[in-house]
Every structure is written in C-alpha cells, then in structure tokens.
Amino acid sequence: MRASYLFTSESVSEGHPDKVCDRISDEVVDLFFREGPKAGIDPWAIRAACETLATTNKVVIAGETRGPASVTNDQIESVVRAAIKDIGYEQEGFHWDTCDIEILLHPQSADIAQGVDALQPGTNKEEGAGDQGIMFGYATNETPDLMPAPIFYAHKILRLISEARHSGKEKVLGPDSKSQVTIQYENGKPVGVREIVVSHQHLVEDMTSNQVRERVEPYVRQALPDGWITDKTIWHINPTGKFYIGGPDGDTGLTGRKIIVDTYGGAAPHGGGAFSGKDPTKVDRSAAYASRYLAKNIVAAGLADRCTLQLAYAIGVARPLSIYIDTHGTGKVSEDKLEKAVAEAMDLTPRGIRSHLDLNKPIYARTSSYGHFGRTPDADGGFSWEKTDLADALKRAV
C-alpha cells in the first residue's frame, strides 16, 4: 500500500432523485412485510422486487411481488405519497400530494419461485438463492463504525444538514443534495481533508453560492474531526452557482443507481447488484449484508485491520459457491483460517442469513439513504448486520 495518497467518496441525500426511488421501492417491500402477518401469511413467503422511476410530477412503480391480497394499489399509493412528503417535496414540479403515481406490480415468476422456495418440512430441498451473483463486504478500523473515512464523513455531512432541515432550522434548504470528500492519507491512515464538495438545493431562488456556504459550512465542520479542515482545504459549495430546481423535477431518478454510495464509496469492490426494492431472498441484498457483517466482525475481533470478503451464489442453490477473504496484509491469522471460521460461525445459505440477521421484517426504508453500512443497529432489528456479536465466536474459531 502507498504511504501517502488521496481518496475521494461521495454521498447523496434522501432527496436525490435516485434516492427518492430507492426509498419508494423499499417502502413497498416494508409494506408487504407489515401486511403479510396481518393476513396470516408467513413472512418467509413474502417476495418483492420493486423498481421505481421518478420524474417531473410522475412516479412509476413496477416489479414482481408475492404476498397478501390486502395490499392494494390505493394502499401502495398512500405509502408512496407519505414517503415523498417525509422527504420534503412540495415544489411545483414534484409535490407529494399532486404527482401522478402509476403502479405496475404483478406476481413473481413461477420459474424463479421454484428455484428459490424450499419444499415442505421433511424434504431435502433447501431454499435456494434468488439469483446468481457475487457480493462483497468490507470493514476497516479507520473510523469508529469500521467504515472507510471518505464515505463515512460524506454521509455524516449530509445527515447533519438533513436533520437541521427537518427540524426547521434550515428552512431555505431543499431536500436534494450531494457531498464529496477528498481525504488525505498518511501511512495508510486518514489525517485530513483536501477537498470538500457540497451541492445543495435552495428554496429561495436568488440565493448565491456564498449564502449557501454560510448555511452548510457549520455542519461540514461539525461532521469532520478537529484539525482535519485547514487553510489548505479547498471548498466547492454549489459550484454551478445555482441549485433551485431539484429532485425528480430536475433530474429523473431510478432505483438502484447509487450502489457505491450505498456501500463503501469505492473503497472496496462491488458485485454490481443493487439493494433497494428487494426482499431478502435476493442475495444481492441479504448476502451483501452478511458479507459486511462478517467482515466487520473480523475487524472488531482484532483479527485484521482491514477485511474484504466475497460470497458467490447460483440461483436455486442454497450453499455459497465460494468464500474469499483478503485482509490486505493486516491479518493476525491467515485468510484460509478466516474463510473456514466464517463458514463455521454462520449459516450462509439464504435462509440461514435471513434467520441469523432477522431480515423478514419491515426494516428496509430506513436503509435507503446515507448508506446501508456504518449505521447503528436498531432495537427492532434494523441494521442487524452492523452488530459485532460474532466477534468472540470468530476468535474462538481461529
């Protein structure tokens, strides 16, 4: 590894057009998990693959589902409008109350279902993966949440501004925003910030870039460690000069287009599959969560300072095809021992992952912005993959 280098990651807010779509797609997944038990449907049987497009005063939702008939289009529309309202869109070109919502959901393909569903108890067929693919998890001890510093702080900047906006403290700022942070590394450790970019929608049309900077700079400074911002740090706040038209009215959004923002900011490989809108039979989502969980627990256990972990699956096949670990020269034990240890410590079949991480719940809308990783586990089971409760078992296994 190079001793001195710069690395950059970006984040986007919940009002970014693609994130609006991620939120809507995950609200649909949560709706099916909430309503299923009320209708007597086993949560294990719920299926959802939901894609969303949002543009000027228009939302289109399409995909495949399996769940309670009680989930009607009217109910879905109500959930979607509530989500858009919560994000904060009440502008002429995209308003939660007046935008047109088109819903094009249909039953899951029987061909897919037969490869994924387990047979009845007592048979020998396990629940298979919902698709083929590769998934990566990553952890590093360079931040308290064991996330890479650039994406960690890019998220933190926007979350602080969002909290201020929702509280009413920053009423002139709109929902749509982006951040980007260039971190200086010395001896492989983050030590400062070279460049800061924040582009933030404003609701007063004639606001200047300097006026927007006056609003956002305190939150940037609050987000970053003391001493990281110096007189050499270069600021780019609304560098185009104006950001009044925002959200899906300014730029069409789609589900699943911010997969690097959702994960590690480019500091680790990505298998290519998006998360939002997918129930946990889709290993794009659940196995990526399991990969992060295992990598984080390896680092939390002190078995490595950095860890990249890959899982691979085939559709209809329960067991992972391969497990690969790279500790980037920081491991305290060999990678092959760690690969054996994680396989022993956790059932990595799709059903095993869903059970271990308790994923058959309405816990997904909250993941749709500010990253799926580096978050605090919730009491109701949200962000369960961020727990470090496997660390002791891994230490014993090696």
UniProtKB/Swiss-Prot annotation:
Gene that encodes it: metK
Amino-acid positions noted as binding ATP in the UniProt annotation, renumbered to this chain: H16, D176, S177, K178, K242, F243, D251, R257, K258, A274, K278
Lineage of the species this protein comes from: Bacteria, Pseudomonadati, Pseudomonadota, Alphaproteobacteria, Hyphomicrobiales
Residues the record lists as binding Mg(2+): D18
Compartment(s) of residence: Cytoplasm
A GO BP entry: one-carbon metabolic process
Magnesium listed as a keyword: yes
Naturally occurring in which organism (per UniProt): Rhodopseudomonas palustris (strain HaA2)
Name listed for the protein in its UniProt record: S-adenosylmethionine synthase
Alphabetized HAMAP family for the sequence: S_AdoMet_synth1 (MF_00086)
